[in-house]
Amino acid sequence: MPPLDTIAAVATAVAPGQGGIAVIRLSGPVAEQVAQAVVQCPGHQEWGSHRILYGHVMAVDGQRRLDEVLLLLMRAPRSFTGEDVVEIHCHGGVMAVQQVLERVLEHPGVRRALPGEFSQRAVLNGRLDLTQAEAVSELVSARSRRAADLAMAGLDGGIQARITVLRERLLDQLTELEARVDFEDDLPPLDGTALLNELQAVRVELLALVADGERGDALRHGLRVALVGRPNVGKSSLLNRLSRRERAIVTELPGTTRDLLESEIVLDGVPITLMDTAGIRATNDAVEQLGIARSEEALISADVVVLIVDGHAGWTETDAQLLARIPNDVPRVVVANKSDLDGPPLPGLVDVQFSALNGAGEDAFVQVLLERCGAGDAAGIVLSLNTRQRDLASVAAAALERSHEVAQQQLPWDFWTIDLREAIRGLGEITGEELTEAVLERVFSRFCIGK
C-alpha cells in the first residue's frame, strides 16, 4: 500500500550564506498538485512528466513572488522513489530555500521528510534494493575517488548481485535437504560430501567479502594518524611534506606546535587525517601543557600512531619513553626523520628512514603506514560491505560452520536445515529480501534528510 502522505525536504546541502542552486524534493500522491498550486509557470509551457518548466514560487496570497525557479515533474513509476516526484530548483540562499520549503509545507497533505525517507520509499517500491540505498548514502559521504568508486559499485548492484548468487546457492542446497526430509524414500541418496563442500565454498566467499569490507572501511571512513615525538624532531615538517602545504609552523624553536593541528590528505586512495601533536615533554608553560594533554588523547583515539625520531641526533631515552606510552592495541610506525643528514646507527625497531626536507623515503613510509593499519591493499578492493552488511555476512558464515558441525555428528537432515535457514535469512537481510521495520530503522535513520 503506497504512503498516504507526501514528503518534502531540501535535497542539497545549504551552508550559511549564499549558494547557487538548491533543490526542494517532494514525493507522494499530491506532489504534482502541490507543484501546480505553488509554482506559477508563465506562457505556453507544456506541463508533463520529465520536462523542465520555468516559473515563480508564489506566496499564499498569489501576489508576491518568493523565488524564480525551475520545476521538474517525474510521474510514477519513473522516479527515484517510484512515486510522483517533484523537484523545485530554487536559488541556494538560506532565506530563499527556507521560504520555498515553508510554502510547500503549507499545502495540505505535505510533511517534512524523515532522514533517509526518500531512499526508504525507493526500497519499499522496488526501485532500489537495500544495498543500493546504502550505496547512495556512501556516495554522498565519499571522501576520496576510491571511496566513490566503491559506492558506485554498490549502487550499480554489485553487492546485491554477489549476495544474491550466494543466497541462491544456499537455497538450492536447502531445497535438496527439505526434499530428503519429506520424500527420502522416493529420491536417490544425497551426496552429503558434495553438499558440505558447497556450503564451505559459500562460507569462504562470505569471509572474503567480510575481510574486503574491513579493509574498505579505510577508504570509506578514512584513518586518523597521530604524529608524535620529541619537540623539533620534524613532526610539523612531515605533516607539511605529506599535505603539500605549510599547514604547521616550522621553526627551530622547540615546542612551537602548542595545539593539535589536523590536515586532510589522501594516500593511495585512503583518506587520512594527520594529527600533528605538540611535542611531549616536561614544561611549565600552561598553554603548552594543554597541547601536550591533547597529544596524549590523540595517542588513544588514533587508528595508527607515527613516532618520529631525529635520525641525525639518534635514538634517545625520551624516544623510548614515548614509544612505551603508545597503547599496545594501537598500530605504530617508527620513522627516523632527517635521513638527509648523517647520524649514529639506529635501533632495529625503526621502520623507515625519511627526509621531510627532500621527500626521500616518502613512498616507503606511505606503504608501511597503510600496511600497519590493514589498508595496504585497500586500493585493489572491488566490492566492500559496510558494517551492517558484514555483521550479517559473518552471522551467515557462522551458521554455515555450525551446519558442518551438525553434519559431523551425523544428525538427521532436518537438523542441517536449521542453520542453513539462518544463513539464508541473514543474506536476505543484506539485500532487503528479508525486510523488517527494525532493519529499515537501522539503515535509514543514519541517512541525511532529503536523501
UniProtKB/Swiss-Prot annotation:
Cofactor binding, note field: Binds 1 potassium ion per subunit.
InterPro entries (UniProt xref): G_TrmE, GTP-bd, GTP-bd_TrmE_N, GTPase_MnmE, MnmE_dom2, MnmE_helical, P-loop_NTPase, Small_GTP-bd
List of residues binding GTP: 232-237, 251-257, 276-279
Residues that coordinate or bind (6S)-5-formyl-5,6,7,8-tetrahydrofolate: R25, E87, R127, K451
Pfam families hit by this protein: MMR_HSR1, MnmE_helical, TrmE_N
UniProt xrefs under SUPFAM superfamilies: P-loop containing nucleoside triphosphate hydrolases, TrmE connector domain
Binding site for Mg(2+): S236, T257
Domain of life assignment: Bacteria
Physiological role: Exhibits a very high intrinsic GTPase hydrolysis rate. Involved in the addition of a carboxymethylaminomethyl (cmnm) group at the wobble position (U34) of certain tRNAs, forming tRNA-cmnm(5)s(2)U34.
Subunit structure: Homodimer. Heterotetramer of two MnmE and two MnmG subunits.
PANTHER family: TRNA MODIFICATION GTPASE GTPBP3, TRNA MODIFICATION GTPASE GTPBP3, MITOCHONDRIAL
Protein name in the entry: tRNA modification GTPase MnmE
Species for this entry: Synechococcus sp. (strain CC9902)
Gene: mnmE
